[in-house]
UniProtKB/Swiss-Prot annotation:
Role noted for this protein: This protein is involved in the repair of mismatches in DNA. It is required for dam-dependent methyl-directed DNA mismatch repair. May act as a 'molecular matchmaker', a protein that promotes the formation of a stable complex between two or more DNA-binding proteins in an ATP-dependent manner without itself being part of a final effector complex.
Protein name, per record: DNA mismatch repair protein MutL
Family under the similarity heading: Belongs to the DNA mismatch repair MutL/HexB family.
Biased composition (Polar residues): 372-383, 391-415
Domain of life: Bacteria
Keyword vocabulary terms for this entry: DNA damage, DNA repair
DNA repair is among the record's keywords: yes
GO cellular component: mismatch repair complex
Length: 624
């Protein structure tokens, strides 16, 4: 067959394979066009799960008659005109493919009117050349897109559609996602003539929490902690599930970048790492929105725009992690410290003035500001947060509101639940902590009191004397050796595995399957549990030494190492210790463990110290 240019309709149908996967993807493209047009209300009507009819009506700016013919053409868009525009794109659409692709696999009509037009116009494409016809019509300001009989001319694609109920579920799920980030828009969804969703526009935080409860459930809205912080051009807002509840509030896990819902491994890792020490064995729920300079993120890396690429990925990762970690720590301290101070009188006063999570009473004039209520032990951390970010993190349970603080009525879903006791909170918080690797060598207060630690220089070097020598012994060298020795002793019986809060998914390398099969017992011995699913390596459990490491980089490095050799216990212990040198993170703890070693072991480790030439200094600077 000779090379030939494809007919326009066939080319559009091929392109539709990426853009139009199912009715939900059609609605996604059309509604996003409505939002780009400045609509404040979007009405969605479908029949038979969207396979029979999809109709989107909005009150946006509309399309002029002159542009209507181009609207159904490929690569025609009003969103950008140069490569510089693409580097700073903030609109949902920008490729100019959606309408052309949808019209090639359905009977599509586009009716629109602008504010300065007297009459509306309707456009539709017909024939193999996809010629666009424009005729007069009656329509208010805005646009209506109607797609009938989806995949009517591509029966193979139509056979892949699921049941009407399943397709509706996908549509409903997508609408929830967009309704959470665009709370300023009024959305309605009608299925088979019946209104099934009605999300009214919100103007206040109280109204947004009502939408949050409507979409993600009452339980999540009651437990949610508000996140609101900014640093330079990065801003993170939203809600996360409180770590002090054993069961997941919902299966809500939405992350938005500049208003666009994305799935990103870097983001997932940052969230998982922030929740690591609060692990409940279930996945945390969250609705988070990241805003940043559009020049710092590339949204043109996925056909459906579900993925993005950050130019400074590590910076973004650390920012998200620190913001969430600080918020969770602040709430944890308030939950325990403040609850211990409550008595019967303060508890009764909390009902008069309004109260926030875990029984922390809030004055009537306060709104999401705990900066003056924090216990003394929390003050330093709060100040650190204020130095790190240009505005403090508002880590406040969502059911504290202006309405409550003014003594007014509140929605039923935000009524205060029975609070756990201080002892219950404290004991549960202790359970949430990552177990110590060796609790026997920690917290021995009596032994620590009897052991005198030598002077320490810059918090990193002990100053020792041995005969006529003055030595500098690095704390890190000793802490690393102690950890390596500890791991080595435990490897014979195998390390304890800890389940991850959220399993980590990594794209499979073709060489990993053989390595996983050959080293299965070894991986199990060091506490790593993985599975393979749909071309992805799913990391489910790791030893405590790897909990804070970058698993997306560490595990591939480990598999590459295991591919060529079977390391000894000493080598494995050294590798694990290298990825967790925080076991003896304080000099007193490290010295306490060091002092319990045999004398000959201590002597060998002291040989790693640096000798200071103090005699030559005295000769160079003699005393008068």
């Amino acid at each position: 067959m000779t090379i030939q240019i494809l007919p326009p309709q066939l080319a559009n149908q091929i392109a539709a394979g990426e853009v139009v996967e199912r009715p939900a993807s059609v609605i996604k493209e059309l509604v996003e066009n409505s939002l780009d047009a400045g609509a404040t209300r979007v009405d969605i009507e479908i029949e038979k799960g969207g396979s029979k009819l999809i109709k989107i009506h909005d009150n946006g700016s509309g399309i002029s008659k002159e542009d209507l013919g181009l609207a159904l053409s490929r690569h025609a868009t009003s969103k950008l005109s140069s490569l510089d525009d693409l580097d700073a794109i903030l609109s949902f659409g920008f490729r100019g493919e959606a309408l052309a692709s949808i019209s090639s696999v359905s009977r599509l009509t586009l009716t629109s009117r602008t504010a300065d037009q007297v009459e509306a116009w309707q456009a539709y494409a017909e024939g193999s050349d996809m010629a666009v016809k424009v005729i007069p019509a009656a329509h208010p300001v805005g646009s209506t897109v109607e797609a009938v009989d989806l995949f009517f001319n591509t029966p193979a694609r139509r056979r892949f559609l699921k049941s009407d109920k399943t397709e509706f579920t996908h549509i409903d799920e997508w609408l929830k996602r967009i309704a959470l980030v665009r709370s300023d828009i009024h959305f309605t969804l009608k299925h088979n003539g019946k209104v099934v969703r009605n999300y009214r526009a919100t103007n206040t935080q109280d109204q947004y929490l009502q939408r949050l409860a409507q979409i993600s459930g009452k339980k999540f809205a009651e437990q949610a902690i508000e996140i609101n912080c900014q640093h330079d051009d990065l801003k993170l807002t939203g809600y996360v599930q409180s770590p002090f509840f054993e069961t997941p509030a919902s299966d809500t896990q939405y992350f938005y970048v500049n208003g666009r819902l994305v799935r990103d491994r870097l983001v997932n890792h940052a969230v998982r790492q922030a929740f690591a020490e609060h692990e409940t064995g279930e996945q945390a729920s969250y609705v988070l929105m990241l805003e940043l300079d559009p020049h710092q993120v590339d949204v043109n890396v996925h056909p459906a725009k579900h993925e993005v690429r950050f130019h400074q990925s590590r910076y973004v990762h650390d920012y998200i992690f620190q913001a969430l970690q600080s918020a969770l720590h602040q709430v944890g301290r308030l939950a325990i410290d403040s609850d211990n101070k409550l008595d019967t009188d303060s508890h009764s006063q909390s009902h008069e003035r309004g109260h926030s999570a875990y029984g922390v009473a809030e004055p009537s004039h306060s709104r999401h500001d705990y900066s003056h209520q924090t216990a003394p032990s929390t003050k330093a951390s709060t100040e650190t947060n204020r130095e790190r970010f240009s505005s403090p993190i508002s880590a406040v349970p969502s059911h504290t509101s202006d309405v409550q603080s003014r003594g007014g009525a509140t929605s039923s879903y935000r009524q205060q639940a029975e609070l756990p006791s201080a002892a219950a909170i404290a004991s549960y918080a202790e359970l949430l902590k990552t177990p110590d690797v060796d609790q026997g060598n920690r917290g021995n207060k009596e032994l620590q009191a009897n052991v005198s630690m030598p002077p320490i220089l810059a918090g990193q070097y002990w100053v020792l004397t041995q005969e006529e020598q003055l030595l500098l012994l690095p704390v890190r060298i000793i802490s690393t050796w102690l950890l390596q020795h500890e791991i080595s002793n435990k490897l014979d019986s195998g390390l304890v595995s800890q389940p991850l809060l959220m399993p980590v998914s990594i794209s499979m390398d073709e060489t990993w399957s053989d390595t996983l099969a050959e080293r299965e017992l070894l991986l199990r011995k060091i506490g790593i549990e993985v599975t393979i699913r749909l071309g992805q390596l799913i990391i489910k459990k790791v030893p405590p030494y790897l909990r804070q490491s970058q698993l997306v980089a560490v595990i591939p490095d480990l598999l590459q190492w295991l591919r060529f050799e079977e390391p000894s216990n000493e080598a494995l212990a050294s590798w694990l210790a290298k990825h967790d040198d925080k076991r003896f993170e304080s000099a007193p703890d490290t010295w306490l463990a060091f002092s319990q070693l045999d004398d000959n072991v201590q002597d060998e480790l002291i040989k790693k110290a640096k000798v200071l030439p103090w005699q030559s200094w005295l000769e160079e600077y003699p005393s008068d």
